[in-house]
Amino acid sequence: EYFKLQIGKIGNIIFNYYIDKNLNKVELEDSSGEVIQFNLNKSNEEIYLDTLIRNKIEIEAEYWRNIFFTYINNLRYKREEILFEKNFKNIEKALKDGNKIKIKYHNYIRLINPYFIKVSDSESRSYLFCYCEKNKDYRNYRVSEIEEIWFTNEKIEIKDKKYIDEVYKNFDPFLSYKNRVKVRFTEKGLELYEKVLINRPKFLVKDNNIYTFECDNKLAMIYFAQFFSLIEILEPQELREKLQNELENTLKIYKNREDKDV
C-alpha cells in the first residue's frame, strides 16, 4: 500500500495518467526484481490494446516498467498530485470560483471555506488549509485523505485575512503559528533533542535549559511524549495536564500487569 492505496489502484491511475505522456526509458542489468501483478479496470482494459499499438509497444513488461519508474522518479508530493488528481482539480476549481465545498474526511462530512493548498516541507505531503464550519476553527486536511468533494453555491468567507496570510507564509501541518510551548530539559533530554529531528518544532528562544518553541499541543504530544522523564512541560497548562494524564494512564497499564503477575 502507498498513500493508503492498493497497488492495483495505483497501477490503474498511473496507466491512465501516462497514456499520452512521454516515459523515461529504463534499462535493467538483470530482471530479478519483484514482480507486480494487478488487473486493469474496465475503462483502462478497453483502451489498453489501442495504447500498445499507438505507442508501438513490443514488450509489455518493458512498457509497464517505464510507467512505474517514470512515476517513482517524481518527488513524493508530485506522486500525490498524480494519484489524487481529481481532488486537486476539484479544490482548485472551488478556489477559482470562490465557493465553499463539502468534503468527506475520515468518514465525516464537513462544510469548509477552502483557502489554499500547501506542501509540507517536513512530510512532502499536500494539505488543504481551510475554515471548517463543523468544528468552528481553522484546519489542515490532507488532500490524499479527502474521500469525496461536493461543490456548493455558497461563497467563501474570509474569516481573518491577516491570520490566513501568516499561516501561508509560516506553514506547517500542525498550524503551530503563534502557539507557544515551554519545556525544561535535563542534560540527557538536550542530548536526545539534538538527535530527534522528525517532527521537531520550531525553536524560538532559550533560558539555560528552558526552551520555548512555536508549537501546537498536537505536535508537542507527538514529539515530546518520547522524552518521558527527560523533560518537563512548563507551559501551556492544558498541555502539561494532558501529558500528565497520558503518563498516569500508561503507568496504570504497567501496574495492572504487575498485579496480575503476583
Where are these regions (language model features)?
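Short Lys/Arg-rich basic patches
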Residues: E1, D20-E45
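Short amphipathic alpha-helical segments
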Residues: L5-N16, I57-F69
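Short, basic alpha-helical nucleic acid-contact segments in DNA-binding proteins
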Residues: Y17-N22, Y71-N74
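A generic structural signal for beta-strand entry/edge sites
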Residues: V35, E123-R125, D207-T212
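Extended, charge-enriched helical/coil interaction regions that scaffold DNA-processing
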Residues: N39-S43, Y48-E58
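Short, surface-exposed beta-strand/loop "edge" segments at domain boundaries and coil↔beta transitions
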Residues: E46-I47, R110-L111, N135-Y141, L190-Y193, ...
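Core beta-strand-centered patch of the WYL/Sm-like small regulatory domain
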Residues: N73-V181, V262
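Polybasic (Lys/Arg-rich)
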Residues: D172-V262
